[in-house]
Amino acid sequence: MSNQKKNDVSSFVKDSLIGGTAGGVSKTIVAPIERVKLLLQVQSASTQIAADKQYKGIVDCFVRVSKEQGVISLWRGNLANVIRYFPTQALNFAFKDKYKKFFVRHTAKENPTKFFIGNLLSGGAAGATSLLFVYPLDFARTRLAADVGTGSARQFTGLGNCISSIYKRDGLIGLYRGFGVSVGGIFVYRAAFFGGYDTAKGILLGENNKKASFWASWGIAQVVTTIAGVVSYPFDTVRRRMMMQAGRADILYSSTWDCWVKIATREGPTAFFKGALSNAIRGSGGALVLVIYDEIQKLMGFEGGVGSE
């Protein structure tokens, strides 16, 4: 193996470890908000939540879940989420830098437009590629978080039980329910998430962005994650709804398009944004991922990464 290939492998492993660690820490911190967001988003498609028992908002959801299922239940599905999130973020960050070498041919100073487009393409392509590998884990995490049962009334006892139960009933296709719309949504989100962050740092902080303060990086990351979350949220709502009908005898939506149409006509356009406020708050975790990743790179003396040119 040539020295160049060895360096590439070493860089890939390094990016995977740092990105995954940063992601796992931030996800655990915002896990309660993550679960509330998912419950608000999918409750209309849940067989466990009757229409007259649906949560009225963030506060109502927090209070009722804590009271009915216990405070610890706010972290339900978190272990699965961390397991899922480690490879997801690791692959996103690692693939992003590989795609970046291909798509980003200009610096922000040389050509801001091409620099921005290159970052959008590299970020989006990284998200779409990694999604293919980890989608069943993301699917299981959603179903576990949406399970509001207690004791024997729970739908699934854990990650393994969830995956095996859906697989036995629907086969592999059941674990990829909503995958099509997910690709579009993840591309939009990751494009804005990575592309916006790298571009903003390059333009606002200049070529010495690696020396940027923690708070400057966090401020940029916070704005970027909020915007990315809002833009891609309708895609996320549709894919979560599609996930909820896997393993069920009664099919709510015949296709992804049917899901878009029924949500819009039966619940109204605002239904696509249920839980969006929780998502914006949760975005702090996404901002932390970007900043923690950069800080770890600084501490370890690595070049490249999220904040690289």
From Swiss-Prot:
The gene is ancA. GO terms for biological process: ADP transport; ATP transport; mitochondrial ADP transmembrane transport; mitochondrial ATP transmembrane transport. Residues 239-244 are annotated as: Important for transport activity. The matrix-open state (m-state) is inhibited by the membrane-permeable bongkrekic acid (BKA). The cytoplasmic-open state (c-state) is inhibited by the membrane-impermeable toxic inhibitor carboxyatractyloside (CATR). This is Mitochondrial substrate carrier family protein ancA. The chain crosses the membrane at residues 12-41, 79-103, 113-133, 181-201, 215-235, 276-293. Solcar repeats lie at residues 10-102, 114-203, 216-299. It is a multi-pass membrane protein.
